[in-house]
């Protein structure tokens, strides 16, 4: 048995499917932006508001503010940045405004986005060249707290998506 669709019905069905797909993609983008924002807030709070660093790490001092100002995120889709945190510059203990760090953080996030040519990529960065040195050699929490939070939230997001697609 076959059913003949009325004229224009196929196009209408295709349009509805496309709308649903767009809505799904927008929900993913919104959630990834929320996760990125929370991760950056956690990473910056560890230093600027005397938050608790990740287990096994210590907080670092904000001397020039360039390191904390370089912390932010970019959300990329198919290698192109579709949204980015503000990389807000904060003032250091020495009065330095942290604008250099803000600029370097943005540039580094954009550079890393190009390395992810397919799908979505949530990129959490500390853009100053000495960030890994401070974190790894001096055991200071630069991005660890933010990264751990992002990983946990992403796992939860994946679990929800998996459950929704099973239904």
Where are the regions a protein language model picked out?
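N-terminal, Lys/Arg- and Ser/Thr-rich interaction peptides
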Residues: 1-23
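Alpha-helix initiation and N-capping motif
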Residues: 10, 64, 154-157
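Short, low-complexity, charged/polar segments at coil/turn and helix-coil boundaries
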Residues: 19-131
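Protruding loop/beta-arch "assembly-hinge" segments enriched in small, turn-prone residues
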Residues: 136-167
């Amino acid at each position: 048995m076959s059913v003949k669709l009325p004229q224009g019905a196929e196009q209408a069905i295709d349009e509805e499917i496309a709308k649903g797909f767009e809505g799904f993609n927008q929900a993913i983008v919104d959630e990834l932006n929320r996760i990125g924002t929370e991760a950056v807030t956690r990473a910056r709070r560890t230093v600027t508001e005397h938050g608790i660093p990740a287990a096994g790490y210590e907080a670092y001092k904000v001397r020039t503010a360039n390191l904390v100002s370089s912390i932010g995120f970019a959300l990329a889709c198919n290698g192109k940045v579709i949204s980015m945190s503000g990389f807000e510059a904060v003032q250091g203990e020495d009065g330095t405004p942290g604008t250099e760090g803000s600029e370097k953080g943005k540039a580094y996030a954009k550079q890393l986005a190009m390395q992810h040519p397919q799908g979505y990529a949530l990129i959490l960065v500390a853009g100053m060249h000495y960030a890994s040195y401070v974190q790894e050699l001096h055991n200071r929490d630069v991005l660890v707290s933010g990264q751990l939070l992002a990983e946990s939230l992403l796992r939860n997001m994946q679990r929800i998506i998996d459950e929704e697609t099973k239904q």
